[in-house]
Amino acid sequence: MDFTNFVGFDGKKELLPCGFDTFDSEVKLRQLFLHLSNFVLNSICHFNKYEQKNFAKIPLKNAFESKIKSLLPLHKLNRLNNFDKNRKFNLCSSSTRIINNYYNPKTSQRLIVNSKKLIPAAKLISHCFINNKMQLLMDKNLLFHEFVLEKLRKLHKDKEVLDLGDSISIKQKDVCALKIYTSWKNIQRKDPNIEKEVNHAINVIKEGDYNQVYLIYPKDNDFTRHIPVYVEELKYKTYQIKAIPYSLRSIIRKNI
């Protein structure tokens, strides 16, 4: 498997992005991953600011093990013959089996839990406990896309911000729509290496629905300003193509 576009962990092995901008340490890169993982895991769990800051100090495997533990109710390890029979529970057999297998498939203990509380824990286990091994790998381009999308929705509340899957569209009444493509790619200002993305932007403009296309990448030390792109074959059209740096620093600032 090619791990080039993935971040996360495979057992004790961590796949963190190369250091960039102010993300110059293992702790900051872990914190970045924990924050961005919320976009994919939002229906299962959420790492709050405190967890992001403190779990970043330990390996990602341990961080997710701690998160699973925090999602389980306090009575998770009660034996069948010791639990409070006067307390009512809605048992979820599938979730119970998942959690039992996660802790110890040979144990004689059985979990007596409230299914409403258990389901997130079981779902998280099913996402990151694969073949009896802790593992969670995510597409970094998807994570960056979701991060930019959330930022744009907060910034342009008076406009229509649409997630088109491979791109983002911003529409406003009586104004030509803007199309945005995101990519987690290290950009060097003198040699940005974005020919493929620019050619795609040219085709989008030629189709006529958009005259502005922005190519957004993570901000880095050598990529701090917009890079305008001029295209000879579009010189008689009104258009705008830009490569734009997008900062991820707010993730660190939020958790200080």
What is the predicted role of each segment?
Residues 1-137:
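Terminal, charged accessory segments of proteins
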Residues 134-256:
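Catalytic core segments in nucleotide and nucleic-acid processing enzymes
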